[in-house]
Regions:
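Extended non-globular C-terminal regions
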Residues: 224-386
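Bacterial Sec-dependent signal peptides at the C-terminal "C-region" and cleavage site
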Residues: 1-9
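Well-ordered, non-membrane alpha-helical segments in soluble/globular domains
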Residues: 32-45, 82-98, 124-141
Length: 386
């Protein structure tokens, strides 16, 4: 039943390529012989992903070129010794294009770039160049429809040349690129690594194909859930017992950013209607055991996240009724915490507390492709027959 519906579930990538920007604007994260949250978090994430990589990290500099790769073990030593301090500048569109052209999404390969994502044109033409930058990003993403993106924002100390503190919480980005299912899985992992080092700020998805989230039907009242079709069929509904048949649709939220698991954001994300005219009510349940986002379920490195919607079917005139429901990502898209919004709206490229021009990057991706969910509804047959 309902073979036309594609269910979205996170899936770990088969392989990962690791990239890191080494440019002048990143120097404060790389200063020698000083422990920073950047070094701790990046190494935690890179070493955690190491078993899926080719054992190398690919630095990027000189306008956006992919430099000679560094063996992962040597990368940690060089990072701690300040050997990635650089006088080069990078060009984000070139950097992005070079990375995307080296991703084989047919083999579930994902790329991860660590960067401050600052694009800083100079002089009188700066405003015009920023708009052109947004269009460049749009074109790159538009011409590569197989690639979805997610970001995780973290903060770290940013150091002056003498090792003194220039900014206590300077933001940077893990940018994840690949298939939607792979990107979502790795976004969860990287966000958890950042949370573990107390550096997590925000995460978000771009150009994602969410389809229909994986779900299950639970707690059927006045009916029985079919063991053969547990996603689509409820039998033995008895109007003489009660006018109402109710059940819970549990939406798997693992595929969505952490910010999404909020009652104010997703209260109207699920909509339902009947095919033959019966009444249908939908309610998001907000009690602790019904709206859950556990980033380390049972102390394992695993996210467990779901939202329960109570469905009530009543005023049923026939022996059978079909409920059609959809879950939309639209209330979720672009909903960020205030701290992150403040970071991406800074107007001074030298403001180390912000992500100068990252809002232009986000707008460029959105202008190319929106996050989408399937329009085809899920159908649940509620029958009075066994």
């Amino acid at each position: 039943m309902d073979s036309t519906v594609t269910l979205f579930q996170t899936r770990q990538p088969e392989s990962i390529k690791l990239y890191i920007e080494t440019s002048g604007s990143m120097n404060g994260f790389f200063r020698a012989n000083k422990p920073t949250n950047f070094k701790k978090t990046v190494w935690s994430a890179f070493s955690g992903m190491a078993h899926k990589t080719d054992g190398k990290v690919y630095p990027m500099s000189n306008g956006g070129d992919i430099d000679t790769p560094v063996i992962l073990g040597d990368f940690r030593r060089k990072m701690n010794a300040g050997q990635f301090v650089s006088n080069f500048s990078t060009h984000i569109p070139a950097m992005l294009l070079n990375i995307i052209q080296n991703i084989d999404t047919t083999k579930n390969e994902v790329a991860v770039l660590v960067s401050d994502m600052k694009y800083s044109p100079m002089g009188e033409s700066a405003a015009t160049e920023l708009l052109q930058y947004q269009e460049q990003i749009r074109n790159i993403i538009g011409y590569n429809p197989n690639v979805s993106l997610s970001f995780v924002c973290a903060t770290s100390e940013y150091l002056n040349k003498d090792g003194s503190m220039a900014e206590e919480k300077s933001p940077y980005i893990f940018l994840i690129m690949g298939n939607s299912e792979n990107v979502a899985a790795l976004r969860n992992d990287i966000a958890r690594w950042c949370e573990a080092t107390d550096s997590y700020v925000e995460s978000g998805d771009m150009a994602m194909e969410y389809h229909t989230p994986s779900y299950e039907i639970r707690e059927v009242k006045n009916g029985l859930l079919s063991p053969t079709y547990p996603r689509n069929l409820i039998t033995t509904y008895d109007r003489e017992v009660s006018d109402t048949c109710s059940f819970i649709i549990r939406i798997n939220m693992n595929g969505f950013p952490w910010t999404a698991v909020d009652s104010e954001i997703i209260k109207d994300a699920l909509t339902a209607k009947s095919v033959y005219g019966s009444s249908v009510d939908v309610e998001l349940l907000t009690e602790q055991d019904h709206l859950v986002d556990d980033h380390a379920y049972q102390r394992n490195f695993e996210r467990r996240s779901y939202a329960d919607y109570l469905i009530k079917l009543y005023n049923v005139a026939m022996d059978d009724e079909v409920i059609e429901w959809n879950f939309t990502n639209q209330p979720i898209d672009g909903r960020y915490f205030v701290d992150f919004n403040n970071m991406i709206t800074v107007t001074d490229e030298n403001d180390l507390s912000g992500l100068f021009s990252f809002n232009k990057f986000l707008d460029g991706v959105v202008n190319a492709r929106l996050n989408t969910s399937d329009k085809e509804p899920v159908r649940i047959l509620v029958s009075s027959y066994q």
